[in-house]
Amino acid sequence: MAEFPASLLILNGKSTDNLPLREAIMLLREEGMTIHVRVTWEKGDAARYVEEARKFGVATVIAGGGDGTINEVSTALIQCEGDDIPALGILPLGTANDFATSVGIPEALDKALKLAIAGDAIAIDMAQVNKQTCFINMATGGFGTRITTETPEKLKAALGSVSYIIHGLMRMDTLQPDRCEIRGENFHWQGDALVIGIGNGRQAGGGQQLCPNALINDGLLQLRIFTGDEILPALVSTLKSDEDNPNIIEGASSWFDIQAPHDITFNLDGEPLSGQNFHIEILPAALRCRLPPDCPLLR
């Protein structure tokens, strides 16, 4: 086997009892690969482990978990200064794994791990909200965000992404669209939004293609607004067809400003952020990520 530089796996604490993962790591170590492993316990651990990875001189920091873990590790990487910043590797171990799925990361642990260590490192974009919080995949607001935020952890653990749909149907009678105004480059819209998707990536909420035209290295954010006065009729309409659907508003820009008369909540790769004013901008070529050669999200 060819020699590969060392890597450090930052593993979400929920995945520590994953026996197949342990076996895959041990097998690669026996083949001569150097793989350090660190386990997160609380917020901030990933940033500390990234600094440790740089001291080790590893070529790759692997995010082992769901979209939230990928977000935390990638955010820590783009905050690094200097040369020789490690690339991001992805090992999908979460409930939905939306970003990993959309970029074509293999489901098989051994294949995903090998890609994370030895795949080509390609410069990709990230997005930043209000000059602080970042996301690598998508910011979603409205009905869908409240569902994913409020869905019980036990339900997600038992049913996976289907749990979001079940919980949404249970809450249908209590949820209303959000009134807001959105501006971007050559874009302006105001009205009642059922769901707002601002994507660097394409899908969220367990496989929902909210921004099907998004690319992760084009310097743009894709916007999709699903409109409607009543939740259920509008939801049925948006699920039918995208073509000439009056309930779907689309736009593309390197930035978007969102204003609302009341607090609305955006889900940034699984992390909620509430407020009335949001400035979301793309950070072009913010980090390098090890991706498959046929990744569909590259231009």
UniProtKB/Swiss-Prot annotation:
Cysteines paired by S-S bonds: none
One GO BP annotation of this record: phospholipid biosynthetic process
Keywords on record: ATP-binding, Cytoplasm, Kinase, Lipid biosynthesis, Lipid metabolism, Magnesium, Metal-binding, Nucleotide-binding, Phospholipid biosynthesis, Phospholipid metabolism, Transferase
Listed InterPro entries: ATP-NAD_kinase_N, Diacylglycerol/lipid_kinase, Diacylglycerol_kinase_cat_dom, Lip_kinase_YegS, Lipid_Phosphate_FormReg, NAD/diacylglycerol_kinase_sf, YegS/DAGK_C
Enzyme class, broadest EC rank: transferase
Active site, renumbered: E271 (proton acceptor)
GO MF: ATP binding; lipid kinase activity; magnesium ion binding
pH profile: Optimum pH is 7.5. Active from pH 5 to 9.
A matching Pfam family: DAGK_cat
Cellular compartments per GO CC: cytoplasm
The organism's place on the tree of life at top rank: Bacteria
Transmembrane annotation, as ranges: none
Details of cofactor binding: Binds 1 Mg(2+) ion per subunit. Ca(2+) may be able to substitute.
Stretches assigned to the DAGKc domain: 2-133
Family recorded in the similarity comment: Belongs to the diacylglycerol/lipid kinase family. YegS lipid kinase subfamily.
Subunit structure: Monomer.
UniProt protein name: Lipid kinase YegS
Organism listed in the record: Escherichia coli (strain K12)
Species lineage: Bacteria, Pseudomonadati, Pseudomonadota, Gammaproteobacteria, Enterobacterales
Designated gene of the protein: yegS
